[in-house]
């Protein structure tokens, strides 16, 4: 379908991205409606998806999305946790409405619901996990584009993009390339220059790993206590520098060979002890008059 137009043809750099992310790796089972997308079967039972069929369906989906005038009429959904980040990034890049996480029943059919929506197009990450959304879309005639594996049910799916919709890198790569092609068809970005958004931003990240990286970055950015550095660049006092430190006053010392002069005779008896004893009012040597017996 896209072989006649060089801009829409599959390029080598896109094939390298597909192979590095594992987009071509299917499951061990194959549905009857997905047999045309399988290239071959490996010895371990995993089916290989034909990447040329994947690219043709991806370009068809991008043309369908670009044909809608209002980007807000496109709804992208992912109940699978690995696709929530990719869905949010796709919606941020293209202006679509994201539904990441659990789908509330009645979003497309119950008009009295607070989050009631009437999109013109629905894009799903996995039709098996997003079965409720696809069922409601069939009630109100909303066309559905879905990333499908070899064993995915294609009921209520109008445009199936065969790929590995279970891997983190595969889901992120598919949503990234789909967003890039939509922006190319809308004329927002040029095909001559590469898109400045990296595919890694569409990959799922564990919140615990993000918190650990933030803590490590905070510790690395904190400045350690620097040791004391003496300032040797200060000006020296010229008056002190010009002084002769050798001209010190001579202090005459004492004659240590002379006999020490005794000013007091410590062997003499001290005088006045009797006066001190008479000053005491009581006589401690006097026997007691009280008979305790």
Curated annotation (Swiss-Prot):
Region (Disordered): 219-293
Leader sequence segment: none
UniProt KW Iron-sulfur keyword: no
SUPFAM superfamilies: Ribosomal protein S2
Subcellular locations according to the entry: Cytoplasm
Keywords: Cytoplasm, Ribonucleoprotein, Ribosomal protein
CDD domains given in the database record: RPS2
GO annotations of cellular component type: cytosolic small ribosomal subunit
Chief location: cytoplasm
GO terms, biological process: ribosomal small subunit assembly; translation
Oligomer and partners: Component of the small ribosomal subunit. Mature ribosomes consist of a small (40S) and a large (60S) subunit. The 40S subunit contains about 33 different proteins and 1 molecule of RNA (18S). The 60S subunit contains about 49 different proteins and 3 molecules of RNA (28S, 5.8S and 5S). Interacts with ribosomal protein S21.
Xref: NCBIfam families: uS2_euk_arch (TIGR01012)
Family: Belongs to the universal ribosomal protein uS2 family.
Function: Required for the assembly and/or stability of the 40S ribosomal subunit. Required for the processing of the 20S rRNA-precursor to mature 18S rRNA in a late step of the maturation of 40S ribosomal subunits.
Name recorded for this polypeptide: Small ribosomal subunit protein uS2
Species this chain originates from: Hydra viridissima
């Amino acid at each position: 379908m896209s072989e006649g137009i060089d801009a829409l043809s599959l390029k080598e750099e896109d094939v390298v991205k597909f192979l590095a992310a594992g987009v071509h790796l299917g499951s061990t089972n194959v549905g009857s409606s997905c047999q045309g997308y399988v290239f071959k079967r490996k010895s371990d039972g995993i089916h290989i998806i034909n990447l040329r069929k994947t690219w043709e369906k991806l370009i068809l989906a991008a043309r369908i999305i670009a044909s809608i005038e209002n980007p807000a009429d496109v709804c992208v959904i992912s109940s699978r946790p690995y696709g929530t980040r990719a869905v949010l990034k796709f919606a941020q890049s293209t202006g679509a409405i994201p539904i990441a996480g659990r789908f509330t029943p009645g979003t497309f059919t119950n008009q009295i619901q607070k989050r009631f929506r009437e999109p013109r197009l629905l894009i799903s990450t996995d039709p098996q996990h997003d079965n409720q959304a696809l069922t409601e879309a069939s009630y109100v005639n909303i066309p559905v584009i879905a990333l499908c594996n070899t064993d995915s049910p294609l009921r209520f799916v109008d445009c199936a993009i065969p790929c590995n919709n279970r891997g983190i890198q595969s889901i992120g790569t598919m949503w990234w390339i789909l967003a890039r092609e939509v922006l190319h068809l809308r004329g927002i970005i040029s095909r001559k220059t590469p898109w400045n958004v990296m595919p890694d931003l569409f990959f799922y990240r564990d919140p615990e790993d993000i918190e650990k990286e933030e803590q490590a970055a905070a510790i690395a950015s904190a400045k350690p206590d620097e040791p004391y550095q003496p300032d040797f660049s200060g000006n020296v006092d010229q008056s002190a520098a010009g002084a002769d430190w050798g001209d010190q006053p001579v202090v005459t010392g004492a004659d240590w060979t002379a006999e020490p002069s005794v000013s007091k005779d410590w062997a003499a008896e001290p005088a006045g002890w009797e006066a001190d004893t008479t000053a005491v009012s009581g006589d401690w040597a006097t026997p007691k008059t009280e008979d305790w017996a």
